[in-house]
Curated annotation (Swiss-Prot):
The keyword 4Fe-4S does not apply. GO terms for molecular function: benzylsuccinate synthase activity. One of its GO terms (biological process) is toluene catabolic process. This is Benzylsuccinate synthase alpha subunit. Catalyzes the addition of fumarate to the methyl group of toluene, leading to the formation of benzylsuccinate. The keyword Lyase applies. It comes from Thauera aromatica. Activated by the benzylsuccinate synthase activating enzyme BssD. Rapidly inactivated by oxygen. Residues 40-712 form the PFL domain. Induction: Induced by toluene, probably via the TdiR/TdiS two-component regulatory system. Residues 731-850 form the Glycine radical domain. CDD domains: PFL2_DhaB_BssA.
Length: 861
């Protein structure tokens, strides 16, 4: 590594030599290629042969990846055969047909088994969701084969698709605007994108046989109620839909048990007739025993729990319906089974290192999991497979530290195996034990870009606040409010046996303030990308005599866009309730089971989040306009519009003035006061006037993922000095790349000024590699985190990777396959990201800590 960095602090010279002296021998531009350390040779082999499904610029990074046809074929077969039956039962039979007839996949070395397509290089498609998304695959090199059959399937499903069912409820003009993905993210019914928090707890604690018994008891009770004298139609007829839902739950659960037992038979056949290695043969027989029992029965040990959870994940996220995510409180969920196997050794006894290996194997299964996302989502998650994100840490229902040895096993496995997925959210509380915090730090220090950190206590408060709007008065209790996870990158939601989020149309999707500001300046017209009217006619900027007129024009554009975006989600939710029932997910939820309702329809805990992305470009632009045009009157709005139309060409001095105007992230009230007002009054205030399907206000949770690149490329030049087509700000409240010039604690102070209705925004920070890898690294990071917590900031995530190493990877990508970076809400292998995206990460300031920063953090070195 490079020469040792030093700093004078509190009267002494502090040296930041590597904590591990051997790192001094490693060239700085190849550090991360030396950090992988799988716990066993098996996981080393599994990683070497992993069939990654990462995509960038809409294309898959690895050769041989393609869409499979089995799921869509078998779903279509069932849909045709069940004409005339109630929709929930049709959906259950569709799942059953897939599980009964689909090809099973069993791979060498794996212990956790199960895949969701007919080949490990394949992924399924979902013609029942978006006809546009599937049609795009059919026109690509990833088309399922036979192509003629695939086209016939898509044609069959088009009138039945979620997209086709939703479109008639919108003005075609509004739809066309939404499909541009410039002012708002494409409607959920057009993208097919989804997310869910499966109630894993009921599967592991009860087993599916118990869920079947519950549903059958409910059916018997309902029939008895319907037969009572005197007949009362208003209440009696309500049982009909409930009975259909319970019947569908039974069909779905029985199908999943049978599918798991098909895996058991396959493992037994391979062991008894084909496997020659005695050790692997015994292992296959053990897997067969587990699959015979799981998920039919309650889990008893850690191997049981891991396999049962994996089967549940596949059904909920890939087979019954597509859903992004890997949402779960994994350490709390698995702790009883870790305790049984590792500590008490009462069932499936093992050592801690064996638990670490199991987690490494799960991480590789997730890395291999393919998702048939639309092209738009393959573009906006550059370098990603899908947004697989789990949650750790935080506090228990009684407020005590929730960290345990399972938490540490997950973090250790993560550090060792070095995969981009699943990403991890850590709920930071000052109650968390130091041992676990050290593991969190080491993962961050080693450049994984995660765990990202969420404020534990703020999350609990958010769950309790959302609970106030519960439609049936059964929102989160104070104890349940502690059991929250991130649904995807940023939005928190309850996990557990009941009240978890079941569909993306509850919370998610995005709105783009930078583009909205651009069209606000042009009477609602998008001149730089779509070349069409994108919003209401609110006037031309050159005619705005005051800044308040501009502010109010933006408010109207924002109101139009956010109302359209939320309406898209709620219309989609309504059609999901009618035609896209999820009988398996419903069977796992105690509320759905009790009430006989489908998971899409039941909403006990509102979770209405929506993502403003590119907010800082818009905010910085408003600051510059106010200062240079309305306050100082150095320029006129007409001059600014001419400069923007010219992409600043010929207006270089003027651009310098706008670029040098006060910027967010420097603890400068000349920027921070107006931008804080922008966040609280417009982005949050106007959004919260909208009430979603669940009865609660929609709240902002800015999380850029890769949309800051995609939308940046569709946004013309902006008054903050940005050129047209350049990437926007990379978080939800992160400073624009390279403009945070006053150090890491100035960023914290700026962000902390936004308090009202704005506590769910992504903050990206890039920290000094020498400082983080020194013996002082943990102490500085820990003090930073405690300060962040005290400032009541919701989120932060870190890149700890040098510019030198990233540029080396650009020159010789084949030598840097293990270099991982945080993009925004997810991590990716640097070499899988397009150059445009790579350069946005290089452009982020690498924050050093000076003496003033350390004093503000009150750190002792």
């Amino acid at each position: 590594m490079s020469d040792v960095q030093t700093l004078e602090y509190k009267g002494k010279v502090v040296q930041f030599a590597p904590e591990n002296p051997r790192e001094a021998e490693i060239p700085a531009d190849e550090l991360h290629e030396h950090l992988q350390n799988p716990s066993t040779e098996r996981t080393r082999r599994l990683k070497a042969r992993c069939r990654w499904k990462h995509a960038a610029a809409g294309e898959f990074c690895e050769k041989g990846v393609t869409a499979g046809i089995e799921r869509m074929r078998l779903l279509t077969e069932s849909h045709w055969a069940t004409r005339g039956e109630p929709e929930p039962i049709r959906r259950a039979h569709g799942l059953k047909n897939i599980l009964d007839k689909s090809t099973l996949v069993l791979q060498t070395d794996e212990f956790i088994v199960g895949y969701h397509a007919e080949d490990p290089n394949m992924f399924p498609l979902y013609p029942e969701l978006s006809y546009m998304a599937v049609q795009d695959y059919l026109k690509s090199k990833y088309s399922p084969q036979p192509a003629k059959e695939a086209q016939e399937i898509v044609d069959y499903w088009k009138p039945f698709s979620l997209q086709a069912r939703c479109e008639p409820y919108f003005d075609p003009v509004d739809l066309h605007r939404g499909y541009q993905v410039s002012t708002i993210e494409g409607p959920v019914f057009a993208t097919g994108y989804n997310s869910v928090i499966p109630p894993y707890e009921t599967v592991l604690e009860d087993g599916l046989q118990a869920r079947i018994a519950l549903a059958e008891e409910k059916i018997e009770h309902a029939r008895a109620e319907m037969e009572k004298f005197p007949w009362h139609a208003p209440s009696g007829l309500e049982w009909i839909d409930k009975i259909d839902n319970w019947k569908a739950m039974v069909i779905a659960c029985k199908a999943v048990i049978a599918w798991a037992r098909r895996h058991a038979r396959l493992c037994k056949i391979v062991a008894e007739h084909f496997e020659t290695d005695p050790k692997r043969k015994a292992e296959l027989l053990e897997i067969a025993d587990i699959c015979q029992r799981m998920p039919a029965e309650p889990a008893r040990g850690l191997k049981d729990a891991m396999q049962s959870k994996w089967f549940t994940f596949l059904i909920c996220h890939a087979i019954e319906r597509y859903a992004s995510g890997f949402a779960q409180k994994e350490d709390s969920l698995l702790w009883p089974y870790y305790k049984a196997s590792v500590i008490d050794k009462t069932f499936q006894p093992m050592e801690h290192k064996d638990a670490v290996e199991l987690i490494e194997m799960e991480r590789l299964k997730v890395s291999e999991h393919g998702a048939g996302k639309s092209r738009a989502y393959r573009e906006i998650f550059p370098g990603s497979n899908d947004l697989f994100i789990l949650t750790l840490g935080g506090t228990n229902g009684d407020g005590s530290d929730a960290c345990n040895d399972m938490t540490d096993a997950i973090l250790e496995a993560t550090k060792r195996i070095r995969t981009t997925e699943p990403s991890i959210v850590f709920r930071y509380s000052k109650k968390n034990r130091a041992k676990t915090l050290r593991w969190v730090f080491e993962c961050i220090r080693d450049g994984l870009g995660y765990p990202s950190i969420k404020h534990n206590e703020l999350g609990v408060q958010q769950m309790l606040e959302m609970a106030k709007y519960s439609r049936n008065g059964n929102g989160a209790t104070p104890e349940e409010a502690h059991y929250w996870v991130n649904v995807l990158c940023m939005a928190p939601g309850l996990a557990g046996r009941r009240k978890a989020q079941k569909t993306r149309s509850e919370g998610g999707s995005a709105i783009f303030p930078a583009k909205l500001l651009e069209i606000t300046l042009n009477n609602g017209y998008d001149w730089s990308y779509a070349d069409m009217q994108m919003g209401p006619e609110t006037g031309y900027a050159k005619d705005f005599a005051t800044f308040d007129q501009l502010w109010e024009a933006f408010r109207k554009q924002y109101q139009y866009a956010i109302a359209l975006a939320i309406r898209c989600k709620d219309v989609s939710r309504t059609m999901e309730c009618r035609f896209l029932q999820m009988p398996f997910v419903s069977a796992l939820d105690d509320g759905c089971m009790e009430l006989g309702m489908d998971a899409n329809a039941l909403s006990e805990q509102p979770n209405g989040w929506h993502n403003p992305i590119t907010s800082i470009v818009a905010g910085n632009s408003l600051v510059a306009i106010k200062k240079l045009i309305y306050d100082e009157k150095k320029y006129t709005m007409a001059q600014l519009m001419d400069a923007l139309q010219a992409n600043w060409e010929g207006y270089e001095e003027m651009r310098r003035d706008f670029k040098n105007a006060p910027k967010w992230g420097n603890d400068d009230d000349d920027a921070d006061v107006l931008i804080s007002r922008f966040y609280e009054e417009i982005l949050g205030g106007e959004m919260m006037k909208n009430i979603n399907y669940s009865g609660g206000p929609v709240k902002p949770t800015g999380q850029a993922v890769g949309l800051y690149m995609e939308v940046g490329s569709r946004t013309g030049p902006t008054p903050d000095g940005r050129f047209g087509g350049e990437a926007a700000d990379d978080g939800g409240i992160s400073p624009y790349s390279g403009t945070d010039k006053k150090g890491p604690t100035a960023v914290l102070r700026s962000v902390s000024k936004v308090q009202k209705n704005q506590k769910a925004n992504l903050l990206n920070q890039r920290l000094s590699v020498p400082i983080m890898r020194s013996k002082h690294g943990f102490d500085i990071w820990h003090a930073y985190m405690d300060t962040w917590h005290d400032l009541n900031i919701d989120h932060v995530q870190f890149n700890v990777v040098s510019t030198e190493e990233m540029k080396a990877a650009q020159r010789e990508p084949e030598k840097h396959q293990d270099l991982i970076v945080r993009v925004s809400g997810f991590s990716a292998r640097f070499v899988d990201i397009p150059t445009y995206g790579q350069n946005t990460i290089i452009a982020r300031n690498e924050q050093n800590f000076n003496a003033q920063d350390l004093e503000f953090l009150n750190v002792e070195l």
